[in-house]
């Protein structure tokens, strides 16, 4: 499937964003470990969270988590502490995404996990019965989801969990988000210093829980505000908390110097909202370390290129093990639009302002990656007509993305 996008002349809209996928998936695992009966409220309706809900309810085997990397990691730990044998499998791409570091860590704690096909990669056969816990050391620069998966099972282990992180710790806001949710459900879990986290052996408490809306989804609306030529544009996004524990709430500070002003307020019903308006761009070049907000990188890279702002972005090492190699994908697709990017050290992207000719009728490949589709869609403000291949990938995190764009005035034609 392919769609053609044309941007609206004016941008004035109020949008209800989807619930946070990151919070939903963590809350569901913790809720299950707590033995809760009523699901958390405002759970995300995206593919990844649907897969998580289905897997937690499924009684037969194997459990197909499709392309949901979060589910693969969190459920590997979850099923290790629950009785029975479960096989976790997924898409062809999922079977190429390494999971050996997490499996080795779980085995160190006593888990019984076998690789069904290829050593170090899914599918996994997990025989439950991990109960002891104890001390564990992990590199800090692995996926934060490995760390979160281990932390969340800590309270149900007899000895709890003491986790040491060595080297550079990346994506720390996601670890902090996990610790916050654990505490919200009654666990005692905290950093004891910059390298160590201690989780006490104290069972979770079933707790009514409401999930806030998604700051990652908000980033695409920030991009639209930055790129629209409408100087009077105004976007209101509902359900976003100013004091959010989501790491991607940093988006409002990131977009401030490139022309987007954020105002926090509550509407007449008391619902927290943000109002986005345009302001002058206050920089000629940008440098930023995305080590703590890797999921914002695609949006920000594309936005800066479209604005003609040279940049050097670091801390991108985790982008290579996401739904696709996002560094390579960004280089290939922005080249189609006339922006030759360069990679350095496997963790940096930079653009010096050089332009090349735009390919006629550019079609953006999405690589089974929802964030590629959503980050490139607003390019139609700059490139008059742009095409997106396999647009349905947005269902992974923001199922109603294209509907919301139509509501604000984008012309979207299925071809």
Language model segments and positions:
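Short, structured segments at the rim of ligand-binding sites
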Residues: 1-415
């Amino acid at each position: 499937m392919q769609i053609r996008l044309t941007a609206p002349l004016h941008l004035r809209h109020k949008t209800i964003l989807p619930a946070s996928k990151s919070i939903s998936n963590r809350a569901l695992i913790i809720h299950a470990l707590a033995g809760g009966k009523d699901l958390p409220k405002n759970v995300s309706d995206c593919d990844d969270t649907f897969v998580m809900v289905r897997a937690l309810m499924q009684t037969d085997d194997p459990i197909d988590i499709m392309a949901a990397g979060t589910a693969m990691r969190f459920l590997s730990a979850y099923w290790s502490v629950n009785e029975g044998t479960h096989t976790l499998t997924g898409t062809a791409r999922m079977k190429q995404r390494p999971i050996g570091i997490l499996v080795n860590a779980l085995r160190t704690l006593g888990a019984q996990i076998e690789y069904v096909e290829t050593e170090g990669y899914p599918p996994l056969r997990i025989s439950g019965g991990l109960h002891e816990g104890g001390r564990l050391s992990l590199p800090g620069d692995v996926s934060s989801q490995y760390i979160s998966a281990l932390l969340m099972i800590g309270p149900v282990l007899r000895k709890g969990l003491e986790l040491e992180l060595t080297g550079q710790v990346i994506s720390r806001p996601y670890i902090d988000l996990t610790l916050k949710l654990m505490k919200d459900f009654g666990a005692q879990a905290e950093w004891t210093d910059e390298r160590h986290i201690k989780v006490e052996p104290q069972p979770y408490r079933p707790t009514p829980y409401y999930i806030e809306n998604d700051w990652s989804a908000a980033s695409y609306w920030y991009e639209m505000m930055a790129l629209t030529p409408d100087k009077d544009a105004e976007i209101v996004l509902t359900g976003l908390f100013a004091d959010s524990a989501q790491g991607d709430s940093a988006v409002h500070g990131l977009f401030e110097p490139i022309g987007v002003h954020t105002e926090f307020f509550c509407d007449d019903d008391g619902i927290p909202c943000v109002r986005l308006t345009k302001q002058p761009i206050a920089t000629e070049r940008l440098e930023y370390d995305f080590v703590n907000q890797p999921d914002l990188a695609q949006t920000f890279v594309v936005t800066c290129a479209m604005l003609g702002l040279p940049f050097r972005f670091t801390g991108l090492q985790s982008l290579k093990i996401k739904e696709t190699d996002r560094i390579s994908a960004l280089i290939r697709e922005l080249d189609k639009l006339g922006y030759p990017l360069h990679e350095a050290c496997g963790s940096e992207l930079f653009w010096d302002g050089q332009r090349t000719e735009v390919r006629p009728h550019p079609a953006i490949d999405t690589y089974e990656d929802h964030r590629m589709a959503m980050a490139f869609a607003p390019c139609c403000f700059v490139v008059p007509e742009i095409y997106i291949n396999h647009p349905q990938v947005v269902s992974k995190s923001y199922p109603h993305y294209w509907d919301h764009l139509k509501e604000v005035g984008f012309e979207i034609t299925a071809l």
